[in-house]
Amino acid sequence: MSLERELRQLSKAKAKAQRAGQRREEAALCHQLGELLAGHGRYAEALEQHWQELQLRERADDPLGCAVAHRKIGERLAEMEDYPAALQHQHQYLELAHSLRNHTELQRAWATIGRTHLDIYDHCQSRDALLQAQAAFEKSLAIVDEELEGTLAQGELNEMRTRLYLNLGLTFESLQQTALCNDYFRKSIFLAEQNHLYEDLFRARYNLGTIHWRAGQHSQAMRCLEGARECAHTMRKRFMESECCVVIAQVLQDLGDFLAAKRALKKAYRLGSQKPVQRAAICQNLQHVLAVVRLQQQLEEAEGRDPQGAMVICEQLGDLFSKAGDFPRAAEAYQKQLRFAELLDRPGAERAIIHVSLATTLGDMKDHHGAVRHYEEELRLRSGNVLEEAKTWLNIALSREEAGDAYELLAPCFQKALSCAQQAQRPQLQRQVLQHLHTVQLRLQPQEAPETETRLRELSVAEDEDEEEEAEEAAATAESEALEAGEVELSEGEDDTDGLTPQLEEDEELQGHLGRRKGSKWNRRNDMGETLLHRACIEGQLRRVQDLVRQGHPLNPRDYCGWTPLHEACNYGHLEIVRFLLDHGAAVDDPGGQGCEGITPLHDALNCGHFEVAELLLERGASVTLRTRKGLSPLETLQQWVKLYRRDLDLETRQKARAMEMLLQAAASGQDPHSSQAFHTPSSLLFDPETSPPLSPCPEPPSNSTRLPEASQAHVRVSPGQAAPAMARPRRSRHGPASSSSSSEGEDSAGPARPSQKRPRCSATAQRVAAWTPGPASNREAATASTSRAAYQAAIRGVGSAQSRLGPGPPRGHSKALAPQAALIPEEECLAGDWLELDMPLTRSRRPRPRGTGDNRRPSSTSGSDSEESRPRARAKQVRLTCMQSCSAPVNAGPSSLASEPPGSPSTPRVSEPSGDSSAAGQPLGPAPPPPIRVRVQVQDHLFLIPVPHSSDTHSVAWLAEQAAQRYYQTCGLLPRLTLRKEGALLAPQDLIPDVLQSNDEVLAEVTSWDLPPLTDRYRRACQSLGQGEHQQVLQAVELQGLGLSFSACSLALDQAQLTPLLRALKLHTALRELRLAGNRLGDKCVAELVAALGTMPSLALLDLSSNHLGPEGLRQLAMGLPGQATLQSLEELDLSMNPLGDGCGQSLASLLHACPLLSTLRLQACGFGPSFFLSHQTALGSAFQDAEHLKTLSLSYNALGAPALARTLQSLPAGTLLHLELSSVAAGKGDSDLMEPVFRYLAKEGCALAHLTLSANHLGDKAVRDLCRCLSLCPSLISLDLSANPEISCASLEELLSTLQKRPQGLSFLGLSGCAVQGPLGLGLWDKIAAQLRELQLCSRRLCAEDRDALRQLQPSRPGPGECTLDHGSKLFFRRL
């Protein structure tokens, strides 16, 4: 349908909705109009439609619709490069999504904001925009992983991840982080192929192709871009395909293949462009390429017979390349012109002009010394012409300046140029020389500049010389304009080739680089060097391969990158083709050509996860010791593949990968991995392996063979998870046009897809398409009659349903190529006559048209569940089986009945099965059933559309609540108990649905409670879903602790993969008060899982994450995941000790403190804090600590803070509330003598409430203790003091402390002096003071003597009052008053 026709239809439907007062329907149609207009580059008109949509949503009180309208307005403004306004609307979208607690829209909002920042970077190259884009995309990805995992269908989650991976890949490419860029692109391509996301696959391949092109990797770029072009062709997106052709033409020009570039540009021109500036650029580039092709053809003809003409053509080529900025080819053309000139012995002046052209071009290439050499040659050839010599000497001087030569080399050149200009009596040239000389002197020799400036002022310019210069410039301009006009005429003369038929163009592309030369029919190649056998292996055409080999096609030809047909068959997983090629002598261990990096067919198969192919190669003697250029053996290739795609592999694929690993290990150790004898290739070949015929002729397949064709065998041989490798596994992007057959997303239901490590090749669409193409008749005849009858009955049951049961149709543009389906019953049982009559013309369901974009560099932001907002949906057409009469009028598909649904509703409603076998063949159908009732049920953030089937028993509200609960359980893994409300009114469970609800009504479901299985079962289910084995110690902990108030899994050294199922099992453990995970390996990557679990634990009061390898990035994720939620609102104790947080975590720590308003204990021992701690984020941290009103205990021990950092820290602490402060070993070194000053100032603060102070291991001495004693009277609340492990504290300090305590109202409840230099004997009087002022004293010193122990023993019975106890063991002496 044409654009104008679609616009008219939508505008008509919009006007009808407006007259009917249906604001939601009108808003939905405004949305569709805006999307349609934007898809064709009419952004201003699209923006107006989205503004109307926003106003209608606001009037209809639809907050979610308003949010989406803001997003679309922001996207249109970004496309119009009004980025501040775009970000304003996108942040409004974010706020609305946040207020609605709609995680799906939150994910989209962050992705959209990230995309806009990426556009800003493209516009102004701001690194800050890149960092903001990265942060936004990471937030969006975290929401997908933490909030949406388990709540949406896996296909939608994969679509979201696909686009976010692509956006992150683009971001890291701009940040020049190549490794991360490549990883994200590979993940994006894998998920896009796995889920048939053609538009996202197009973007990923297109952008990866341009990245390879900019990096000079032309072979990889061509394959990625060809894959992108095929995706665009599959989607029937002409503008996207045109952009691919333009970039392909650029790559081909870089490679020097202008003939192929011409074909690509002509195709781009015919396909059209979305923007006029793009079309103008294509025209300009096409004119250039056409001119180059014409001149190259003329040069080829003239080289042998007309050297004079060839010399002229070389000059024209050089000028053409130079004008286009292709300076290396321009220099090459001028060099060839110079050789012809020397061959023809042309005059010196003529050759001098060629040297000038070469020098100028080398200067443009920054080869300034090379330019000087050609200027010197020009000088030699122009000897005696002082004017030309002057200009040449000036050029030499300027080139030497550009090369960075010293002033001593520049000055003589300028002087000679000035002298020649004076001899030629050219004042204007003299002035020019002096101006350049003056500029150089100011920079390199300032003392000589005044003299030159004086000469410049004295020099006058003659009027006639000015006129002469102007005349020369005018002549040069006219010449340039004449050249441009000639090029336009030239391009117009080439337009007659645009009428080529598609078949002729295909033949032209197949011949590719052969040009006019004749070659063998087996040497016909396309632009990538692929032969007919390559293409047949890529497309999986077994019979075509057999025919080619039987006719003598070489078995081992290479394409231009170096791949052989066997590589291709292994790459695409065509098992039977691999078997056939090996049977006929294909080289099993071929390492490929120059561009293949030593990848053998076995590496190739393992790199794509085709384990059956790899097993066959091993049977046939493939080497397991050969390594790629990166040093990878086949076993290491498999391990790398598993590591990359571990998260996306299903359990069956993991098992197969383990089995293949064992097989490779057995083969590497010399054991025979198979019972059958391995196939051995001949030790020598008589002919070149690239051109030798097959070793044995290909036998004709017997007509009565019982062996199933390839596709059938694939289904029989492998498990459902691997059935039909052409459709169940994504292929590498590679190669040219896809076959004419169609593809469908619906086929993926055959089993879980498997990932493939991709080398940069073009589209796998051909193979995916082939998976949808019905097989030959023999395939269909192999099915049994019972299977046919079962399929027939299932099809009949589906006819006449209220809703269409058709799965997603094939991509647009390929529906005509589908072969007709085979009959559902055997021929011998077929009824005579036409017994099936349709009440409407047969039509084929088509997929909704994917959203397009004008700029494919622009990353996508929306998720996969956005279909109802951006694509018009057509009502599924019904086909009824009639017996007595047929309907004369076809059913028209009116405007979409679901177009007015709010975003988030399922795009395809569920349909219940009709009861009974009412549609048996031969029975007339009764009257058509009434239309079904469909009810929308909102359960928290999820909206379900539930059909109520017609039956003899009318369903009740209780049935509807149960259906909604079951759907929520399937989506989220949690089973709620629900009550239903309609517009605030509570619906009674016993009421019948038709009595209280109408079709399309929306009811609100309130969760009264959750039906949670035991924690052990939840842990086991989580392990199964993640493909992770159960950890026995964790299982014991789960069984013992169950759903109690505390859970501990300490010191188990659990890694991230082992912690993930545990954290998921603990979700919604609402009664949990204490969670202890100390001594594990949480790391930064598992924090997202932790945050998701913490969000469901509202009662959590203690969280211990000590010694968990948590870094600054992990702390940042933890802090970012908490604000705005109820997470950790009840947390009272947090332990982050022994994690390498570092000085840069200040902002994250501040956010964490703000997110925990009731926090009373914070432990940060040994976190790697240093002197810079508190420096970069002093304001944020200070504010956070001051606002921590409930903080009672803070431990910063074992962090080498030093005096300055400690001072900043203590200055920010709340002195009036903090009771317990641990500062053990915080000195930066032994010489940190000022450490106690900030402590003294803190203790002297008015209202200081500190009760416990630990200062152990800080290199303190008696002087520090004396100063501390002065503060004891200022801080009467201090009752516990630990000064242990300070070996410079002596007995004098103890006496000083006891004397000070006598002046206080109360003594100390604890004094720690272990590891100090307290030396005995202390004397009986000192022991009396100890007993009077201290409730507990710890001494641990080798310097105590026997008299001290005797004095303590004598002291105990003589004192009345509370009892006392002592511990005297070796050097330890502990005293406590009970």
UniProtKB/Swiss-Prot annotation:
Biased composition, class Pro residues, residue ranges: 691-702
The LRR repeat boundaries are 1069-1093, 1097-1122, 1128-1151, 1188-1212, 1247-1270, 1275-1300, 1331-1354
Q: What is the effect of changing residue 973 to R?
A: In SEMDSP; decreased function in double-strand break repair via homologous recombination
In the record, what terms sit under GO molecular function?
Answer: histone binding; histone reader activity
Q: Where is the composition biased (Polar residues)?
A: 672-684, 883-899, 907-918
Impact upon substituting residue 487 to K:
In SEMDSP; uncertain significance
Enumerate the subcellular locations listed in this protein's record, separating them with semicolons. Nucleus; Chromosome; Cytoplasm
Ranges of Low complexity composition bias in the record: 736-753, 777-789
Which positions carry Phosphoserine? 719
Instruction: Quote the InterPro entries the UniProt record gives.
Output: Ankyrin_rpt (IPR002110), Ankyrin_rpt-contain_sf (IPR036770), Leu-rich_rpt (IPR001611), LRR_dom_sf (IPR032675), MMS22L-TONSL_complex_comp (IPR052311), TPR-like_helical_dom_sf (IPR011990), TPR_rpt (IPR019734)
Pfam families in the record: Ank_2, LRR_6, TPR_8
What happens on changing residue 571 to A?
Abolished interaction with histone H4 and recruitment to replication forks without affecting interaction with MMS22L
Instruction: Spell out which residues are annotated as carrying Omega-N-methylarginine.
Output: 797
Name where the ANK repeats lie. 528-557, 561-590, 597-626
Describe what happens upon changing residue 934 to W: In SEMDSP; decreased function in double-strand break repair via homologous recombination
What does the comment on domains in this protein's record state? The ANK repeats mediate the interaction with the MCM complex and histones, while the LRR repeats mediate the interaction with MMS22L.
What's its job? Answer: Component of the MMS22L-TONSL complex, a complex that promotes homologous recombination-mediated repair of double-strand breaks (DSBs) at stalled or collapsed replication forks. The MMS22L-TONSL complex is required to maintain genome integrity during DNA replication. It mediates the assembly of RAD51 filaments on single-stranded DNA (ssDNA): the MMS22L-TONSL complex is recruited to DSBs following histone replacement by histone chaperones and eviction of the replication protein A complex (RPA/RP-A) from DSBs.
Q: How does it assemble?
A: Component of the MMS22L-TONSL complex, a complex at least composed of MMS22L and TONSL/NFKBIL2. Interacts with the MCM complex, the FACT complex and the RPA complex. Interacts with MCM5; the interaction is direct. Binds histones, with a strong preference for histone H3.1 (histones H3.1 and H3-4/H3.1t). Interacts (via ANK repeats) with histone H4; specifically binds histone H4 lacking methylation at 'Lys-20' (H4K20me0). May interact with DNAJC9; the interaction seems to be histone-dependent.
Protein name, per record:
Tonsoku-like protein
Q: What is the lineage of its organism?
A: Eukaryota, Metazoa, Chordata, Craniata, Vertebrata
